[in-house]
Amino acid sequence: MATIDKHSYAHMFGPTVGDRVRLADTDLWLEVEKDYTQYGEEVKFGGGKVIRDGMGQSQASCFDTVDLVITNALIVDHWGIIKADVGIKEGRIAIIGKAGNPDIQDNIDIEIGPGTEVIAGEGKILTAGGIDAHIHFICPQQIEEAQMSGVTTMIGGGTGPATGTNATTCTSGPWNIHKMLQATNDFAMNFGFLGKGNTSLPLALEEQIEAGVCGLKLHEDWGTTPASIDNCLAVAERYDVQVAIHTDTLNEAGFVEDTMAAFKGRTIHTYHTEGAGGGHSPDIIRACGEPNVLPSSTNPTRPYTVNTIDEHLDMLMVCHHLDPSIPEDVAFADSRIRKESIAAEDIMHDLGAISMIASDSQAMGRVGEMITRTWQTANKMKQQRGPLAPDTERNDNFRIKRYIAKYTINPAISHGISHEVGSIEVGKLADLVLWKPAFFGIKPAMILKSGFIAAAPMGDANASIPTPQPVYYRPMFGSFGSAAAKTSMTFLSQAAIDQGVPEKIGMTRMVGVCKNTRNIGKKDMIHNNWQPKIEVDAQTYEVRADGELLTCEPATELPLTQRYCLF
């Protein structure tokens, strides 16, 4: 039997079981847990390679074969870290397993035929597209910026650089909702819009849900009172949509206890739950211990560094229309920025008490850095806290699964779209991102929407090959013409679909329904469901979880920074 040495095998077909891979310049290492490809029967495309007529490619028609196969990919998802071929059919993940030609090979799950395109996944990491569930839709240019970072779904609200949108993630009222649905029709990105949830009577909320939002947003700048919270959640319960909340920093209408009492045990997504992005000062972070609260962070505080505190004050003044010449406005800003709770936030992510990370795009957060800052946080915690049980010094598989869940499956579950997106699982949209390991978390190698290439780094279009400089991120064919709409989905409430909103306003893209948002809780946040009792000292701002003080030093240096961003 012919053999090949480990180094040559990894170079040719990618890593296999027991091999370890470093994630970019971090201290995080993954180890391959399982390999679905068969040694000696691997498929690979190229001159003199396997995927040729009568060899790895069968004679079968498109009815029996996949449209696209990603060969020898290293899948990193919440459910595992495995090596496999991935077959994609009609825009969805059809099979994860072994690809080839069943006429001459045994145990073939994915049949390759003349109608099958190939993407070489050997030596690359494959992840689900990121889901950013805290978007201020301030400018359309955010969409391309997010896409090029590996994000394929954006959930939030807004209408452009309006004063309300600069501060709050709300698309307010049916007319604005319809305009945003129309404006985003032709982008290669999935969308979900949040209506304004701040009112104490139901009618204005019902009409927004029926107009096409996938959820509602309560924001303190519109008045997040106990009455509006109760009303908003009551309407959401009837329509099966999610509610996101930015609570009352100034404690004008009540304290954190009053807000949590107004929840009445109903499910809610708490934005920037640490508090620097807004929320009851100084103890909104206590919400992380509640069984009905789905907590998230936004990326300006991710991770805690020596620069975090200084940069926040100016950001806050701009985003919330505050005046630095008014002492009360300055005091408002100062009350939100607490190094003690930001330090605790790092540790709460590492222990799974905070379930999600999002951007807060152009409203204190950076839309193209959600994924990067997630892995910077994971790396900081590895350096400061060591392996995360059950991990050992050999690999960080559990920590990697915990952190990738924060921007993929958990926001999908929270907003009722996990049946369509959020993980690499059969039946879901093939919204996928390929990464070279050396660039993982910061520079994707390729972004696919429904199995069609939407964006990638590309060299000089007049060159003789694809790679000559200047190489930079460019939209690909999946971002043009009607293909962008036909490979992308907008998530609406079932009520809006029943009202015929897509047809009435001329939407031509795929439409998905958000569902199962009211019967979930913290327990459903994969790898991130710890519910400690959180206590905050009102004088020192120290944070304790189940009696243990949560604190850490700010980072002075981070991975995934300057060495990747010279141009």
From Swiss-Prot:
Pathway participation: Nitrogen metabolism; urea degradation; CO(2) and NH(3) from urea (urease route): step 1/1
Co-factor binding comment: Binds 2 nickel ions per subunit.
Residues binding Ni(2+) 1: H134, H136, K217, D360
Domain Urease: 129-567
Cofactor: Ni cation
Post-translational modification: Carboxylation allows a single lysine to coordinate two nickel ions.
Enzyme class: hydrolase
Record PANTHER family: UREASE
Family from the record: Belongs to the metallo-dependent hydrolases superfamily. Urease alpha subunit family.
Assembly description: Heterotrimer of UreA (gamma), UreB (beta) and UreC (alpha) subunits. Three heterotrimers associate to form the active enzyme.
Modified residues (N6-carboxylysine): K217
Residues noted as binding substrate in the record, renumbered to the chain: H219
Record's keyword annotation contains Hydrolase: yes
E.C. numbers: 3.5.1.5
A cellular-component GO term for this protein: cytoplasm
GO terms classed as biological process: urea catabolic process
Single annotated GO MF: nickel cation binding
Record's protein name: Urease subunit alpha
Matching InterPro entries: Amidohydro-rel, Metal-dep_hydrolase_composite, Metal_Hydrolase, Urease_alpha_N_dom, Urease_alpha_subunit, Urease_AS, Urease_asu, Urease_asu_c
Pfam families per record: Amidohydro_1, Urease_alpha
Keywords: Cytoplasm, Hydrolase, Metal-binding, Nickel
Keyword Nuclease listed: no
Catalysed reactions listed for this entry: urea + 2 H2O + H(+) = hydrogencarbonate + 2 NH4(+)
Location of this chain's protein in the cell: Cytoplasm
Residues at the active site: H320
Binding-site residues for Ni(2+) 2, renumbered to this chain: K217, H246, H272
